[in-house]
Amino acid sequence: AVSTGGANPGMVSWFVKQALLNIASDMGLQFAEPTTREGWAKLMADAGVKGVHIAERDTQRAKSPKPANVFVNTWSVEGFISEALQPAELGWGTHERWIPDHARTHDTGSGAAIFLLGPGADTRVRSWCPTPGPQLGYLVTHNEAISIADHFTVREEGEEIHLGRLPSAVR
């Protein structure tokens, strides 16, 4: 099945699979490319992966400079407000034996995610992108943060996945 198959979310899920194949190969692990969810989860565990960090930075520029105190971004207004105001949500691996005091588990689903009691716009995470380097982003809810955790979780061993996003011109 293809879930939210655009560039983001979507394509990052495919990048995680390719990165895992590269890591396993570079480590000299003996494996065949997995064809099942359980196979992908086992390969992730065999490679010792405990976390996947998805970082994004909006670097698009307009032809004319942005006026002071004007917010410009590639997110739709509705999407930005929705993601910023809803509780911060992230994949939470089964290897984690605790959750933060201000976090809760979901009543339904696979158990591969938690949510925080504050909105994503109030939750900062240290992040990194290749061009700008280190950055302080926002922990925003994104489909792939949970779908990747769910897809790659071995129920005894898992991983944490979150998306740290820094909108343009927010510093």
Regions found by a protein language model. Give the residues of each.
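Active-site rim elements
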Residues: 3-5, 135
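Domain-scale recognition of functional cores that engage charged ligands
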Residues: 5-14
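Rossmann-fold NAD(P)-binding glycine/threonine-rich loop
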Residues: 1, 15, 19-23
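C-terminal catalytic/substrate-binding lobe primarily of soluble NAD(P)-dependent oxidoreductases
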Residues: 22-171
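General beta-strand structural signal in soluble alpha/beta enzymes
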Residues: 2-3, 54
